[in-house]
């Protein structure tokens, strides 16, 4: 998600969305930490994320999304060159500045102008998961970043993990997601995701295909059981 989000975020910026709006979309509306995408990079460190991306590029097979999106866009590469890694260097995508009277201002590093500017507050018209299916630029961003991540996860069983629970727990415990990908899809409604993918002419990821071919509507049932990769 972090790498896909960075590239899809760039596309959104090119279409007119602000970085603050990208952060607002890629946060609590889709069940992710309230920090948002860019602030999460600042927290982890751009230098750390760049190393992870290079590791993806070296070790993942051709065609894997981690390999495709692992390299930073040009503006973020420039930030690395400038030593602009995030909170630990005093600023990455954002920073706090101090005025003479002791008050503080938050500034955003504008990826288009590559200059610092005052941070602005953004309020979304849709502030929940339904944004995934909205035709607005914000909805397109949510679907292309988060929806793509959900579909990517649906292809990882059984190649990376033996079951869907392992992936869900990894994302909830390791990355503070409110729900892992499969629990999230259950909340959204797998049939809605399947319908959207089909309307776009896309092939269903493995676990969504297994679900569609089964007699079940969700990945989990009310007995604490989950769909296996064999159905």
Regions found by a protein language model. Name each.
Residues 1-231:
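N-terminal glycine-rich phosphate-binding loop for ADP-containing cofactors
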């Amino acid at each position: 998600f972090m790498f896909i989000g960075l590239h899809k975020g760039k596309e959104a910026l090119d279409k007119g969305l602000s970085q603050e709006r990208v952060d607002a979309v890629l946060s609590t509306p889709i069940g992710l930490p309230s920090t948002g995408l860019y602030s999460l990079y600042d927290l982890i460190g751009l230098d750390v994320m760049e190393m992870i991306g290079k590791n993806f590029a070296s070790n993942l097979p051709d065609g894997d999304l981690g390999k495709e999106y692992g390299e930073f866009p040009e503006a973020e590469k420039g930030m690395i060159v400038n030593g602009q890694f995030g909170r630990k260097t005093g600023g990455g995508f954002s920073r706090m500045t101090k005025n003479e009277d002791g008050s503080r201002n938050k500034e955003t590093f504008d990826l288009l102008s590559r200059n610092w500017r005052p941070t602005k507050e953004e309020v979304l018209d849709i502030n929940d998961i339904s944004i995934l299916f909205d035709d607005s630029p914000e909805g397109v961003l949510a679907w292309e970043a988060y929806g793509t991540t959900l579909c990517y996860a649906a292809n990882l069983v059984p190649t990376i993990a033996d079951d869907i629970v392992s992936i869900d727990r990894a994302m909830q415990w390791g990355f503070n997601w409110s729900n892992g990908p499969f629990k999230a899809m259950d909340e959204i409604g797998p049939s809605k995701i399947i319908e959207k993918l089909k309307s776009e002419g896309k092939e269903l990821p493995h676990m969504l295909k297994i679900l569609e071919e089964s007699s079940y509507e969700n990945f989990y049932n009310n007995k604490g059981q989950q769909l296996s990769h064999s159905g």
